[in-house]
Amino acid sequence: MNKDLKGLYAALLVPFDENGQVNEQGLKQIAQNAIETEELDGLYVNGSSGENFLLNTEQKKQVFKVAKEAVGDKVKLIAQVGSLDLNEAIELGKYATELGYDALSAVTPFYYPFTFEEIRDYYFDIIEATQNNMIIYAIPDLTGVNISIEQFSELFNHEKIVGVKYTAPNFFLLERIRKAFPDKLILSGFDEMLVQATISGVDGAIGSTYNVNGRRARKIFDLARQGQIQEAYQLQHDSNDIIETVLSMGIYPTLKEILRHRDIDAGLPKRPFKPFNEAHRQTLDQLIAKYDL
């Protein structure tokens, strides 16, 4: 790897206007908030939290460009370029690489029942076309794709596949991956399981709630790495109270409302997602006050 990619990342939120267009100024504010206020190490751009799969190619490029402009070279940047259209994934990968992103990431192809060989070659094709490092995005609950330890071994044999964003509750597989590949990067993708993932030896984490709860996540990560498990768990309990409440109100509109409370122009979610339900306003205000969000 050209840059040490260990650490904590915001899965960058993207603000939209009423017509579903990207609010560039708001996006810059959200990116800067993640780095300057939440004190995170980097941004994971155009992932699920960016509502990526609702965007067209030009909007995805726009998000890559604006996020890069917002934070420059001072932080780590990972570009999620995965797409069912391999040509789009390659086009996005080339664009992000030209912008100076430190690594690419790509969700496994989904919807159709692809063979492992097809999935493997999808990654190899993106790498060949871009010559950038690749982080596998494993999120089987949404893709239906479960990668075995033997298949991870085949993927990791490629020198440019440097790691995995592991968003799965299978901690046995996580332990097996960590033991088998001590030099590969493992970034946890479940905010609500950060303490468990850290104990299992991950190198960092990527989270949507880190856009508003990154400092608490940092404390969890550091305490768990230092062996202060009871203290880390107490903070994880607090984080999970936040996460549970946010999920109950709709994750993307609620996170954007918390950012709006900070005078950030966080915009709307993209349709068909609904905007924040004002019936939840009192619950949200209480959450912000209780946990200093």
Swiss-Prot record:
EC number: 4.1.3.3
Pathway the protein acts in: Amino-sugar metabolism; N-acetylneuraminate degradation; D-fructose 6-phosphate from N-acetylneuraminate: step 1/5
Coiled-coil annotated residue ranges, if any: none
Record's keyword annotation contains Iron: no
Keyword Cytoplasm found: yes
Residues where aceneuramate binds: 48-49, 167, 189, 191-192, 208
Active site: 137 (proton donor), 165 (schiff-base intermediate with substrate)
Gene Ontology biological process terms, A to Z: carbohydrate metabolic process; N-acetylneuraminate catabolic process
GO molecular function, one term: N-acetylneuraminate lyase activity
Pfam families (UniProt xref): DHDPS
Keywords: Carbohydrate metabolism, Cytoplasm, Lyase, Schiff base
Top-level enzyme category: lyase
GO cellular component, one term: cytosol
Reactions listed under catalytic activity: aceneuramate = aldehydo-N-acetyl-D-mannosamine + pyruvate
Intracellular or extracellular location(s): Cytoplasm
Domain of life: Bacteria
Family label: Belongs to the DapA family. NanA subfamily.
Subunit-structure text: Homotetramer.
NCBIfam families reported in the protein's UniProt record: PRK04147.1
Known function: Catalyzes the reversible aldol cleavage of N-acetylneuraminic acid (sialic acid; Neu5Ac) to form pyruvate and N-acetylmannosamine (ManNAc) via a Schiff base intermediate.
Protein's name according to its UniProt entry: N-acetylneuraminate lyase
